[in-house]
Amino acid sequence: MPLPLLLAALCLAASPAPARACQLPSEWRPLSEGCRAELAETIVYAKVLALHPEVPGLYNYLPWQYQAGEGGLFYSAEVEMLCDQAWGSMLEVPAGSRLNLTGLGYFSCHSHTVVQDYSYFFFVRMDENYNLLPHGVNFQDAIFPDTQENRRMFSSLFQFANCSQGQQLTTFSSDWEVQEDNRLMCSSVQKALFEEEDHVKKLQQKVATLEKRNRQLRERVKKVKRSLRQARKNSRHLELVNQKLNEKLGASSAQQHINALGREPVRAPYLHG
């Protein structure tokens, strides 16, 4: 094998396998924070106390796992609850409790990342082994930084209680009842919209099928018309050929008759006795 080809083959063999690109479902549509908040299993408001490296596992698998140890792609976080869990949540822990949130890091379609000593709003869920994981509803963000805008949004959507000193969120909840009504409507409205979109999609598929059949019928009609035109053309051509043939036959018969008249025998002269 030539040296350049050998080097190229060695380079390809030594290079890591390409990572799988992010592939969302074909029917995926983005959801608002409010709708995702309603669908999230639990919402907590907590401060990150410490970060701990985490080995690759079921919830943080990546094709390039051999880099995880070097780059620190996966980690867990020790967090402290700044308020009781959000109203309606299934996690019954009071403010000041410390929890371990696993499954953080960088993934193919999204990232769950936090910084130590900062506070966040978390969408979390619990697995069958009672591990707390980020709940990335609809393959979207599950962690929100502690900003005034997010405080206003989440304190309006959910009722936090018994917050730590200086972390009261109820100051933004004057429109909570209105937001709660909107929150309860969110899933039903989204479901109705999705059903309507699915119905429209099915109708579009039916229309596309009918249009395809219509095009096929048009092609068949065109072929029949072309065949009919060709048949008429052939018929006219045969008529002309037949007419010319009849004319030739008529002319030939007339010529034969004239020739026959010209060849009548001469009568012998009459002799008197």
Swiss-Prot record:
Keywords: Coiled coil, Glycoprotein, Secreted, Signal. InterPro entries: CCDC3. Expressed in aorta and adipose tissue. Enriched in mature adipocytes. Over-expressed in adipose tissue from either hormonally-induced or nutritionally-regulated obese mice models. Disruption phenotype: Mice exhibit a lean phenotype with reduced fat mass and smaller adipocyte size compared to wild type mice. Adipose tissue exhibit decreased levels of lipogenic genes, such as fatty-acid synthase (FASN), acetyl-CoA carboxylase (ACACA) and diacylglycerol O-acyltransferase-2 (DGAT2). Mice exhibit strongly inhibited age-related hepatic steatosis and decreased number of inflammatory cells in epididymal adipose tissue. It is found in: Secreted. Its main location: secreted. Residues 188-250 form a coiled coil. N-glycosylated. The keyword Cell wall biogenesis/degradation does not apply. One of its GO terms (biological process) is negative regulation of gene expression. It comes from the Eukaryota. One of its GO terms (cellular component) is endoplasmic reticulum. Residues 1-21 form the signal peptide. Negatively regulates TNF-alpha-induced pro-inflammatory response in endothelial cells (ECs) via inhibition of TNF-alpha-induced NF-kappaB activation in ECs. Positively regulates lipid accumulation in adipose cells. PANTHER family: COILED-COIL DOMAIN-CONTAINING PROTEIN 3. Homodimer. This is Coiled-coil domain-containing protein 3.
